[in-house]
Amino acid sequence: MKLVFVHGAGGSSLSFYYQLRHFRNSKAIDLPGHPTGKPCVSIEGYLEWVRGFTTARRYKDVVLCGHSMGGAIAQLYALRYPDELRGIILIGTGARLRVNDDYLNRCASPGEDNAVWMDGQRDYYQGVESDIYQVLMRRSTEVGPAVDLNDLQACDKFDVMDEIQNIGLPTQVMCGSEDIMTPVKYTEYLGSKIKDARVQVIAGGSHYVQLEQYQKVNEQIE
């Protein structure tokens, strides 16, 4: 089995820092534009890029684990190319990812020296341990608000609510109980529509539950 992690909007492979340390031979992808290269403008575009990445490396028995936007990519992969995956793991995501205008506006008008946008990034990572917090913030500044906006706009257009029941791969769905961006009802919906999906709500976790409650998340992945 090859465990491949895909990060969320404006993120990077560092979103799975603790998972990479725990799961031997796993891989976390940096999507284009995060921070190098040009970002894709749609979830479909990111899907094809990820597919190209995994097939070029001849990964076999891939279990694709996606967080937030990465979860959207994983869902679409499972719907479009199910024979290429062994299973999917969805963390803090949904079958539809409508984005609150506050998040979009903060990216579009990030303030002088991106100060307004950076305040939002700090809020995202407030539950993360200090050993990784500063590293995450540095990477955020490298990715920047323009790429974050691009990704959130792609998420805002994502909607597979009419298709999600067609996923036939082994699926695990989890989220933090305090997640505001992708609330528990999103995870419950996925669990109700995907046949035999395993569902877990991690008590006390928020949107970056895999960083905040990494031991519990790793136990669930195992």
Regions of interest found by a model, annotated:
Residues M1-G37:
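Conserved HGGG/HGGXW glycine-rich cap/lid loop of the alpha/beta-hydrolase fold
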Residues Q75, L79-R80, L85-A115:
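Flexible "cap/lid" loop of the alpha/beta hydrolase fold
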